[in-house]
Amino acid sequence: MSADKSPYQIEPYKTVGAHRDLIHCVSFDPHGRRMATCASDMTMAIWDRQPDGNWRRSAHWKCHGGAVWRVIWAHPEFGQIVASCSYDRTIVIWEEQIVRTEKDLKCKESQWIRRTIISDNRSDVTDICFSPRHLGLSLASCNVLGAVRIYEAPDVVDASRWNLIHELQAFHTRCGCVTWSLSRMHRPLIAVGSDEKKAGGKERVVIYENIDGLRKWQRIHSLVFDMPCPITDLKFSPISMVDSHQLAIASGDVHVFNIKVPRTAILEEDGVDNPIHLADYSFQRVALLGDQRKAWRIRYNLIGSVITSTSLDGTLRSWKSLFVNQWVKLSEMNVDDYVPTADEVHKIVEAKTTERLPSQLDKVYF
């Protein structure tokens, strides 16, 4: 690295192209070595990072009967599993399997197998989120009717069986995003956001607490967030303090909140949740990260020290936490900053016009 180059300077990799329509979601696996993308062309693509930093597409197939809104990775502890949700009102669980080719038994190739279709939603599924691994293989989803549904795989080695274990009515308007808290020290929380423009400011974020003694999720009424704009995304920090969570919310700008955890919500050393009453939480907004009121998606890094947002104007902004509740802008990059070479443009156009996609909608492998 040259002396005049900032250690935090962002340099884009080569353009990757696979979809014929608008890309709705880009998701990295927990190790950052694999990437999944989905788009309005009803397809999903899997990418593997190469040693030189470029991305090689390893799979691309038609996965739904409508536009695909989200694709997410489960923790690698459960295998190479991704989930996708779509405008066709379904959630599909996919699992990668390594098989031997028929021509050469020594040669191996990967195949993505459709394990199951969850089709009990009565409306479009807008977001999905896997639970942290210490809670097992569970999945939360939300839909346009304001409902949150939680599914669980009773056997973590069998991704083909999922049971609906909870259904929560978060809003009477559209749900747009859902996320889990990641702390092992506290009772699990689920935060839900509404991107409905007609919703009131105090009716855009709802947080539920899991009380193990009652085996149910209960709404925390003491947490009422008055947000100025529809909620397009929200995420808990992967690192929690002993007595607090940190929650980032994209509502025009990026709002960062500290949620104070009462002693009754802190789990015992053996992980047992003894009290059965609802804990009394409190919160404080500790930072407002300006994004020209266009924040769309937000993510934390692995240690919770950097927040990155993507905006409606095609700009990616990152902020770094320097001290307690102090954030400074780390970088800003626009899609127009990268100009693909003629060779890259030719490869993308060629792939879009000549490629035939394998469809897995008519076949299920077990």
From Swiss-Prot:
GO terms for cellular component: lysosomal membrane; nuclear pore outer ring; Seh1-associated complex. GO terms for biological process: cellular response to amino acid starvation; mRNA transport; positive regulation of TORC1 signaling; protein transport. SMART domains: WD40 (SM00320). One of its GO terms (molecular function) is structural molecule activity. SUPFAM superfamilies: WD40 repeat-like (SSF50978). WD repeats lie at residues 18-57, 63-104, 111-152, 161-209, 226-267, 290-329. Keywords: Lysosome, Membrane, mRNA transport, Nuclear pore complex, Nucleus, Protein transport, Repeat, Translocation, Transport, WD repeat. It is found in: Nucleus, Nuclear pore complex; Lysosome membrane. It comes from the Eukaryota. Probable component of the nuclear pore complex (NPC) which is involved in the trafficking of macromolecules between the cytoplasm and nucleus. Belongs to the WD repeat SEC13 family. Component of the nuclear pore complex (NPC). Probably part of the GATOR complex. This is Nucleoporin SEH1. It comes from Caenorhabditis briggsae. The gene is npp-18.
